[in-house]
Structures are given as structure tokens and as C-alpha cells.
Amino acid sequence: MLYKRNPQLNKNGELIHLLSTEGLSKDILTHILDTAANFVSVNDREVKKVPLLRGKSVFNLFFENSTRTRTTFEIAAKRLSADVFNLDIARSSASKGESLLDTIANLSAMAADIFVVRHSESGAPYLIAQHVAPHVHVVNAGDGRHAHPTQGLLDMYTIRHYKKDFANLRVAIVGDVLHSRVARSDIHALTTLGAAEVRVVGPRTLVPPDLAQMGVRVFHTLEEGIRDCDVIIMLRLQNERMSGALLPSSQEYFKSFGLTAEKLRLAKPDAIVMHPGPINRGVEIDSEVVDGPQAVILSQVSFGIAVRMAVMSIVAGNEA
């Protein structure tokens, strides 16, 4: 019954694919975060390796460009002692018209164990997960506007590291929520982990009208949206996904929704500032904030390796 409801889980309720934070229980999310905590120290060792995925093959399939996410997945897999293969999509058979599932079938024939997939089409990792063998696992590295679960998880790890508990937290997610798969993954994870209040802040043109159904409060002014918040997650303006005149200009956006040191004082004195990257200084956030003591953006990047190690080690230990 559980497997039919959630394709990420096997019949025992164990994680076999990571496709979205939506539908994952608090216990599963906490298990991933706890496992990641055990891997953080690996990054500080002289020999930065553990043998958990020795003999396993991890294929990074990035149909969208990425530097940070692909690199951290590669580092994570290598630190688990896996063999890692980065498919050059621009030169692959996919660029010659081969279908997504045919590409997966051919790579599966090469004894792939884990596919890490980033794709511009929402649902592509789900499609792949439905067609792989029981011992093969799929990790979603971002699909369209839909989800970016490992970013959501590393955001949760970062919040827990600095704030210890979600129960009394007021969290604001600010910016281009309409096009953000990170925002959706964060919202699902925050509500499941019991954050006291999740706010979404942005111009009306960049905030989906149905967000209130996800249990969040919507604000259309930055000052009100971040007031008394414990955590502020800034989002990049995704101009490459925009069509039409959703914004007057980047300069006008910064005036209304750019986070400056002055505006940050409206949040709690010990508030932390996060950003999934890449950062556009002077558009969504001022350099003084990025380089200031309340920004934990580089910690997010560092913790991302441990979180992705946790995800791959957990799914690899379970079968459909």
C-alpha cells in the first residue's frame, strides 16, 4: 500500500529513490539529517573516504547546466568510494535524438547503480525511477520547477545545525518563488519537520496564487515578510525561466525585495541568512549581507556534501 502511494519508498516504507521532499515522513527526513551528521566529520579527515559504496557506479546525468550541485554530488559519491561517471549531455546520444528512457536503458546495461538526474522537465526523475531495475536508484538533482530535494535537505541540515530545533522557528523564503524548485522542497520539508511558521515573500507576479494551500503565509513586502524571522532563505531571480514582463527591472526588484543590512535588522538579531546559489549580488541580496556574520551560505555548500553522501548511502542500502 505504501509503495503505491509513494514511488520513493519500497513496500517496507524504506527510501529507494529521492525524488521530492513531498510525501516523506518526519522520521525519514530526520534519518537523512542524522546520517548526514555522521558524514560531516569525513570532510575533515586526512583521508576523506568511507567504503560504503565501494564497487558501486554512480552516473551523473545533468541535462541542465550546474556547477555546484554536480560537483558536490561527484565529491559525495567519491567520498563514499563509488565509481563516478559524468555524462557529457552535449556530446551524448541524447543530443542526437535518443529518448531519455533509451539513454537510461543503455547506461543501465553498463551496470549503473545510482542515477543522479537534473532535467529541465518536471517529472523526468519520476519517469526514470519507474523504468529502472529494483536494485537501481534515482536521485533527483532538480527537475523543472518541481523539486530539488537534496537542496531542501541541506537547507534543513543547515537550519538544524544553527538553530537546533524547528519547533519555534519562523522562516521566510524570499524572491522568485514561482520558478523555484528549491522553495517547494523547502516548504514541504519545513512543514513536515514542524517549523512554527513558514512565510513566502515576493512580488505578486512571482508568487504562485495557490501557495496558501501548502500551509504558508504569503507577504508581498520584504519588510513585513522578514520581521521577527529566525531564518531567511533568499532565492535567485531565474530570468532564464521567465517569459513576459514579470518584473520592471533588476534594479527595481532590489529596491523592493533585495536584502540589505538595514532591512535585515527587522529580523531577529540572531537570524541566519541562506541562499541556494548562485548569488546575484545587488539583485536579491547585498554584498554586505552575503559577506556578513549572519550569512551561512558557505556552510550550506559544505553541508551539501554530507547530505548527498547520506542520501546515496541510504537509497543504496534498500531495494524495491
Swiss-Prot record:
Catalysed reactions, semicolon-separated: carbamoyl phosphate + L-aspartate = N-carbamoyl-L-aspartate + phosphate + H(+)
Homology family: Belongs to the aspartate/ornithine carbamoyltransferase superfamily. ATCase family.
Gene this chain is encoded by: pyrB
Protein name as it appears in the record: Aspartate carbamoyltransferase catalytic subunit
Ligand binding (carbamoyl phosphate): R68, T69, R118, H148, Q151, G277, P278
Gene Ontology terms: biological process: 'de novo' pyrimidine nucleobase biosynthetic process; 'de novo' UMP biosynthetic process; amino acid metabolic process
UniProt entry keywords in alphabetical sequence: Pyrimidine biosynthesis, Transferase
Classification via Pfam families: OTCace, OTCace_N
Pathway assigned in UniProt: Pyrimidine metabolism; UMP biosynthesis via de novo pathway; (S)-dihydroorotate from bicarbonate: step 2/3
EC numbers: 2.1.3.2
Subunit structure: Heterododecamer (2C3:3R2) of six catalytic PyrB chains organized as two trimers (C3), and six regulatory PyrI chains organized as three dimers (R2).
UniProt xrefs under NCBIfam families: asp_carb_tr, PRK00856.1
Residues binding L-aspartate, per UniProt: K96, R181, R236
GO cellular component: cytosol
Presence of the UniProt keyword Transferase in the record: yes
Superkingdom of the organism of origin: Bacteria
UniProt keyword Transferase present: yes
Function of the molecule: Catalyzes the condensation of carbamoyl phosphate and aspartate to form carbamoyl aspartate and inorganic phosphate, the committed step in the de novo pyrimidine nucleotide biosynthesis pathway.
GO MF annotation terms: amino acid binding; aspartate carbamoyltransferase activity
Disulphide bonds in the chain: none
